[in-house]
């Protein structure tokens, strides 16, 4: 499993910061949504609810499941739990139609924090990120300055963003420019 040791420059101001989050392994999970018995197996093995509504996030024991589509979830699992989890999934799901692929080397997770985090992101994002509309427990696939990302709030002033590795440096550069007015 990849641990994505590539580092990116951090940004830190009094009202906005961004740093890479490296404590998770990312699993893309696909399954047959018509097989009503498969999600309870995933849920039991992962100790995480994957049977979630569109554009929502499930969290348990520090792990996250993000709804990406009717048959797709992105799961963030603590790095030290991934090997046991993969073995248990293979054993319990034997003979079923599913896939789980470790995608950590292809995507980077950034934690954005600060009282202006939503304002900085909204400068390049068409989704309304106001607290009234985008709350903890929700996720969205969108674009920031034409770069595809997945966003989800962890706390009121803490948003986690997942971006493809090949666009991570461009996104950091965009955030450097976007946060200037808030310094």
What are these regions (language model features)?
Residues 1-183:
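Basic, glycine/lysine-rich polyanion-binding surfaces/domains
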């Amino acid at each position: 499993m990849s641990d994505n040791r590539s580092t990116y420059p951090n940004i830190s101001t009094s009202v906005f910061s961004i740093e890479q989050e490296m404590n998770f392994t990312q699993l893309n999970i696909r399954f047959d949504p018509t097989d009503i018995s498969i999600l309870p197996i995933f849920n039991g093995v992962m100790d995480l609810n994957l049977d979630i509504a569109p554009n929502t996030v499930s969290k348990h024991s520090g792990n996250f499941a993000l709804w990406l589509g009717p048959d797709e979830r992105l799961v963030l699992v603590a790095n030290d739990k991934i090997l046991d989890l993969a073995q248990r999934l293979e054993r319990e799901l034997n003979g079923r139609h599913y896939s789980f692929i470790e995608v950590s080397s292809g995507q980077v997770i950034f934690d954005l924090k600060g009282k202006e985090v939503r304002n900085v992101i909204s400068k390049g994002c068409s989704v309304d990120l106001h607290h009234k509309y985008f709350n903890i427990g929700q996720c969205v696939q969108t674009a920031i300055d034409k770069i595809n990302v997945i966003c989800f709030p962890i706390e009121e002033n803490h948003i986690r963003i997942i971006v493809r590795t090949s666009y991570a440096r461009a996104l950091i550069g965009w955030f450097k420019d976007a946060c200037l007015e808030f310094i």
